[in-house]
Amino acid sequence: KKITALSPFVSFTALVENGNKLKVVQVKGVDKQAEDQVSSLSKFVEGDGWQKFAEEGGLVLGSGIAKALDVKAGDWVSLLISQPNGEDQMAQPNRERVQVTAILRLDGQLDHSYALLALPQAQELMGYREDQITGVELKVDDPFKVQEMDYSMLNDYPQLLYIQNWVAKFGYMYRDIQLIRTVMYIAMVLVIGVACFNIVSTLIMAV
C-alpha cells in the first residue's frame, strides 16, 4: 500500500484549429519521463513520436481529432485558450501555434478528445509558475487499496493538493461489472437447470 511513482500535470480545455476546422480537446501537460513511470500512454503513440515529443515538445494529438482536422505528425495547428484569469468573458482567447509531434491511437473515445503537451509549455500557456500545477498523478502498488493509502509523502508538496482516487471517481463502473457478472452467473444456472429439466422430462416420457 505505497506510492511507487508520481507525475505532475497541468490540465485545461482548448480549441484546436486547422484552417476553418475546430475541435474541442482536453489538453494534459506532462513530463515525458514522469509520465512513463505512471502510465502506458507511450505504447499507443504511433512510430517514434513519443521520443520526438520528449526531445522537441509540441502536441501529441488523438487520432480521432487528427482525422477530423485533417492533420498528421509534422503539421502545425493553432491552440485557442481562454484568458487564464477568466475575468473578462468577452476577451479574445490566447492563440498559440504548435506543431503536431505525434499521433495518439487508443482506438477509443479518448482519441476524439485528448491531447498531450509538454509540461513547461502548458504551464506557460496557463500563466503558471514553474512549481504550479493542476494535479499530481500517482501510481500505487495495489490499486484496490487506494482508500487505505498513506499520502504523508505529499505533505511537503509546494502546492495544496486534494486527494481524488479512482474508487471515488469510477468505482461505480467496477461495481456495475461485478453486478453484471452475478446476473450472468444466475442466468446461466437457470438456463442449465431448464435444459436439464427438459432432458429428464423427455427421458421419462420415452420410458
What is each PLM-predicted segment?
Residues G86, A91-M184:
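Mechanotransmission and gating elements of multispan inner-membrane complexes involved in transport
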Residues G47-D48, G135, I199-V200:
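A short, structure-level motif marking secondary-structure boundaries and short turns
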Residues Q178-V207:
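Hydrophobic alpha-helical transmembrane segments of multi-pass inner-membrane transport and secretion
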Residues K52-E55, K139, I204:
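A generic secondary-structure micro-motif detector
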Residues K2-L116, P120-D131:
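A structural signal for hydrophobic secondary-structure junctions
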Residues N20, F53, P93, V167-K169, ...:
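Hydrophobic alpha-helical context, especially transmembrane and signal-peptide helices
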Residues D31, G49, D142-K145, N198:
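Poly-acidic low-complexity segments
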